[in-house]
């Protein structure tokens, strides 16, 4: 099953376990958020929204908040000794799609446990 969601003015085709970068969304790292603007639900019987599918949401886990690559806006007016250089970086949220939900269901998957490096075994040294 797949879904087409809209967030930040852009549309994304997602399936469970997809990892995608979207514009900044409020939410703590490791928390589960719900994306409510589902435009299409695909599968055996596709459902098209008008404009959105009623009762459908997509659950996603927030993996990270970061900044995108720097975009340089350079303007020069020839023969006028005038120029302007500005830089800009987008705020990005990295999401992992956990579930695609229909009919107003709630997410059943909680946040995943963080992986930690195992401490070296003291018994092995003996």
From Swiss-Prot:
The gene is rplU. This is Large ribosomal subunit protein bL21. Belongs to the bacterial ribosomal protein bL21 family. Contacts protein L20. Part of the 50S ribosomal subunit. PANTHER family: 50S RIBOSOMAL PROTEIN L21, LARGE RIBOSOMAL SUBUNIT PROTEIN BL21M. The keyword Zinc-finger does not apply. It comes from Rhodopseudomonas palustris (strain ATCC BAA-98 / CGA009). It holds the Pfam family Ribosomal_L21p. It comes from the Bacteria. SUPFAM superfamilies: L21p-like. InterPro entries: bL21-like, bL21-like_sf, Ribosomal_bL21.
């Amino acid at each position: 099953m797949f879904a087409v969601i809209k967030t930040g003015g852009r549309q994304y085709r997602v399936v469970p376990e997809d990892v995608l970068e979207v514009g900044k969304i409020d939410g703590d790292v490791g928390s589960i958020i719900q994306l409510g603007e589902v435009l299409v639900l695909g599968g055996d019987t596709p459902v098209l929204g008008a404009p959105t599918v009623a009762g459908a949401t997509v659950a996603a886990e927030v993996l990270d908040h970061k900044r995108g690559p720097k975009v340089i806006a350079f303007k020069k007016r020839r023969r006028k000794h005038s120029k302007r250089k500005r830089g800009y970086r987008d705020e990005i949220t990295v999401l992992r799609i956990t579930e695609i939900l229909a009919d107003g269901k709630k997410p059943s998957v909680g946040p995943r446990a963080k992986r930690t490096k195992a401490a070296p075994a003291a018994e092995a040294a003996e």
